[in-house]
Amino acid sequence: MADVFQSERFFREAWPQFSRAFESPSDAASEVEWITGLAALAAGARVLDAPCGFGRHSIELARRGFEVTGVDFSETELERARAAAREAGVTLTLACQDIRDMEFAGEFDLAVNLFSSIGYFSDDEDRLVLDRFWRALKAGGLFVLDTRNRDQIVRSLPPEERKRVNGWTLRIENAFDPATSRWRARWSRIAGPGAARPGPPRGGPDEKRAAGEQLIGESEIRLYSAHELSAMLRPERWSRVELYGGLDGTPFSLDAPRIVLVARK
């Protein structure tokens, strides 16, 4: 079973240090355009974004005239979302809460769980999260879940990735365990010349960090195949369930980088 505390600590303490390195306002705008086109929402419709992080999708939804509630357990990320919303001139309702504890009931026309936000808990708790979203929707409401495609990532996950973040380099060391379907990553900060160039593979997990390299945190996520996620969703209680390979309507395939489940209550 995943070390749930480790994942919670990672997203509270480590993730806010570099989450903006994964920000793409243009992607968020196009993704929201596709989602809202599917949902066919009326002006003023209520939308749940959970977890919302620093609000890139929440803000795009609010720009389109929807009433947006964002839920996240990181107060740091919520503060960023508040600041970004003020700068964008939109209003968000933000709540600091674990998505496992959401108690909404029949309140939303659209609910979204985006950017690989499922899989950090036990399998039973992931099912609970999906139940929370079903309960939060009004009859006829739409749920959109977006995460990594296990069947693609097992064949393409690089042992190491690097990203530039505000003048320093983020190093990500990846490992996938096929026996448990878990993707573990070590996230490190590297300073100094040449930091952006990938180096040779590292040894064991307890090896000494290179000079100028600081371990920021470790994460672990359970990756699901499309049929596993579909079954966890309990499709019999939804009026329609569709599967895509991206938040642009790409058809799903083994080679699609994403699994996007779209379910109508």
Residue ranges with predicted function:
Residues 124, 144-232:
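SAM-dependent methyltransferase
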Residues 1-42, 44-53:
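Conserved class I S-adenosyl-L-methionine
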Residues 127-139:
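A short glycine-rich, Lys/Arg-flanked "PGG" loop and its adjoining helix->strand segment in the class I
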Residues 224-265:
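C-terminal lobe and adjacent flexible extensions of AdoMet/dcAdoMet transferase-like proteins
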Residues 103-110:
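A short acidic, Gly/Pro-enriched loop at the edge of an enzyme's catalytic core
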Residues 114-115:
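Residues lining the SAM
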Residues 56-101:
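Class I SAM-dependent methyltransferase SAM/SAH-binding core
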